[in-house]
Amino acid sequence: MRADVQNTIEKIQKSLDLLAQRLDVETAPYRLEEFNARVEDPTLWDDPDAAQKLMRERQMLVDAMATHDSIKQEMADNIELIELGEMEDDADVVSDAENALRALEETAAKKELEALLDGEADSNDTFLEVNAGAGGTESCDWASMLARMYVRWAEKKGYKVELQSMSDGDEAGIKSATYKITGLNAYGWLKSESGVHRLVRISPFDSAAKRHTSFSSVWVYPVVDDNIDIEVNPADIRIDTYRSSGAGGQHVNTTDSAVRITHHPTGIVVTSSEKSQHQNRDIAMKALKSRLYQLELDRRNAAINEAHENKGDAGWGNQIRSYVLQPYQMVKDLRTNFETSDTKGVLDGDLDGFMAATLALDASGKTRAEAQNG
């Protein structure tokens, strides 16, 4: 067996070992038996929310077991084919099996990354906010480009995207937009996108065709699961209704029933501008609870993050990625050093490489400063 093929097998085995560890493969069959017993309980659906949560957890376990077993079996089958092909001097059989192992390596690596999405809220749906930075029309246009980028990414994933609120820019683009993205692991994938995103390009709004730098921020926070109890003291909030209107476009609603909720202790402000005022109150309150939950997650992780980060790595919580369109084309993540010259693809939603690099870095135990220094 050639050295490169052996190396491929070792990489698959490494991914398989991590999957087995995350799954706790020895106890998985017993846990599935417990789930099955609970599913057969005739009183299960007396509490629909708890029942749905149980069914989701059971399905996640079933899928994880199937993934592990499938990769393990496919690897063994192709190793056997290579050995038989070499014994019988059948180059075609060997070549086909080697190609299958290379494809399996990619699949196993992807499943390994997905297995890292095991944080408390990683499996949840998510809210995603985009806000234009200082810079007027330039930043508003950049915020609009970012919003489109994330909508395209979510659509490619098969996620459901709902616009919660949007404020148009004075001349072009948007000042802000909030989306709800629904799908398994939506928060887990997107959580690393929070931060400041920098764009460098020749401005389409500058008659002198000068190069401009624009900034917009992204904030991602999980939709609060019904089983997570977040209490909001009515005395701590102010609810305002207002008229929401924009300059036009398919995303703009015009309504007298838009709702803004301000949470005084934290200064958090959330809005919703659907047609129903009652619906807007519910949407805005859910968004507020989600933001408060994200604050709690941040507090819990503060000590870990402080220990994890190099003290000189001041850019992590602020600027996370640069998008250079002129004088050359490059998108680079400042935390992981992952980069690509396919700027068009990135702005069209091809973000998985960046997200995977961040997950891999966090799993490696390296500080972001160490990653930046190679």
Swiss-Prot record:
Keyword Membrane: no
Gene Ontology cellular component list: cytoplasm
Main localization category: cytoplasm
Post-translational modification as stated in the protein's UniProt record: Methylated by PrmC. Methylation increases the termination efficiency of RF2.
Superkingdom of origin organism: Bacteria
Listed PROSITE patterns: RF_PROK_I
InterPro entries listed in its UniProt record: PCRF, Pep_chain_release_fac_I, Pep_chain_release_fac_I_sf, PrfB
Keyword set includes Protein biosynthesis: yes
Molecular function GO labels: translation release factor activity, codon specific
Alphabetically ordered keywords of this record: Cytoplasm, Methylation, Protein biosynthesis
Function: Peptide chain release factor 2 directs the termination of translation in response to the peptide chain termination codons UGA and UAA.
Protein name: Peptide chain release factor 2
Lineage: Bacteria, Pseudomonadati, Pseudomonadota, Alphaproteobacteria, Rhodobacterales
